[in-house]
């Protein structure tokens, strides 16, 4: 139901404590810069050796993912990766063998495109490139030519044009270019949870640029997530998140440029070829981090008119969006969990 409010953007404000930790264990915070953002892992009530072993394994995985999941062929200091090789093969109309982990993720992305009615589209790479959002160091100063945008839309790039023979992939559509940015964080969070569990970590919070997942509990309680104003650090509401749940947010504050007083954000509507304008933020809480990641993007594209239907189609119980006018639309599950600061 819509609720009048100031502009909100879901963000993560963590309050961590560990009273009663014994002398052998304590809390550790490790931070890295990876995937173009800040990655923070808060280990709760662990030994130093346990956290160190987990971090070493995470760093190894980061290096592999950062290299292999970048969709474009050139990036300073980064070797040619697997998704870039796949995109080059698709452009050439050639088949290519795909690693099992990435093949499973691409198949999942294609299913999510179908389930969201194309609002999430993993084949949108050329449009992302056209708008310049693939290179944060060189964002555009102005929108691309409208003719080029319409040409991309007319090409109907979609994962439905991917053809599989086992784990060998090909496509007869040269307009298809894979960009898994809309689900990558969700998959990475799930992989990191597995790594932490394998290394004996029972309680932690993993945060990748504001998208997070909770492992276990915080001092025996659910984690508290703050929703704050986009222009200040004021906390407007609190949300409790249980162990095993992920909180994924998509918003117009992550990557954008301004032209003639108008903001152009990185979340693009595949149906029009243009950045989303009606909605500034979408947040989804779900045990399936990949689903939550794609759903946050799809809800941002769907906007207030498509919010209820898409939540029903995807089985989302805890979700909200914030419109450009500052209204909040949320599911009943989200409404029950939120604790408004002013109430």
Predicted segments, located by residue:
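Mature catalytic core of soluble alpha/beta enzymes
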Residues: 2-9, 14-343
């Amino acid at each position: 139901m819509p609720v009048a409010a100031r502009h909100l953007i879901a963000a993560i404000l963590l309050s961590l404590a560990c009273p009663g930790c014994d002398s052998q264990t304590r809390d550790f915070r490790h931070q890295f810069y990876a995937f173009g953002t800040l990655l923070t892992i808060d280990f709760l009530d662990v030994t130093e050796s346990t956290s160190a072993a987990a971090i070493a394994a995470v760093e190894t995985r980061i290096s592999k993912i950062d290299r292999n999941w970048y969709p474009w062929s050139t990036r300073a200091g980064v070797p040619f990766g697997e998704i870039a090789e796949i995109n080059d093969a698709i452009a050439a109309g050639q088949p290519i063998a795909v690693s099992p982990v990435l093949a499973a993720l691409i198949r999942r992305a294609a299913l999510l495109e179908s389930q969201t009615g194309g609002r999430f589209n993993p084949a949108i790479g050329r449009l992302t490139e056209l708008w310049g959002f693939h290179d944060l160091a060189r964002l555009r100063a102005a929108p691309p030519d409208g003719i080029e945008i319409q040409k991309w839309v007319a090409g109907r790039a979609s994962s439905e044009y991917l053809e599989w023979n086992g784990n060998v992939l090909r496509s007869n559509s040269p307009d298809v270019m894979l960009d898994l940015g809309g689900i990558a964080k969700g998959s990475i969070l799930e992989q990191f949870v597995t790594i932490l569990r394998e290394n004996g970590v029972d309680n932690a919070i993993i945060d990748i640029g504001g998208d997070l997942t909770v492992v276990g509990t915080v001092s025996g309680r659910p984690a508290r997530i703050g929703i704050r104003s986009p222009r200040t650090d004021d906390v407007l509401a609190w949300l409790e998140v249980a162990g095993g749940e992920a909180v994924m947010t998509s918003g117009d504050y992550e990557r954008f440029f301004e032209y003639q007083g108008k903001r152009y954000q990185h979340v693009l509507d595949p149906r029009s070829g243009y950045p989303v304008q009606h909605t500034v933020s979408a947040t989804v809480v779900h045990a399936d981090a990949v689903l939550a990641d794609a759903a946050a993007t799809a809800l941002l594209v769907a906007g207030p008119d498509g919010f209820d239907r898409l939540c029903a189609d995807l089985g989302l119980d805890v979700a909200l969006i914030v419109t450009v006018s500052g209204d909040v639309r949320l599911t009943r599950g989200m409404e029950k969990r939120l604790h408004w600061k002013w109430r």
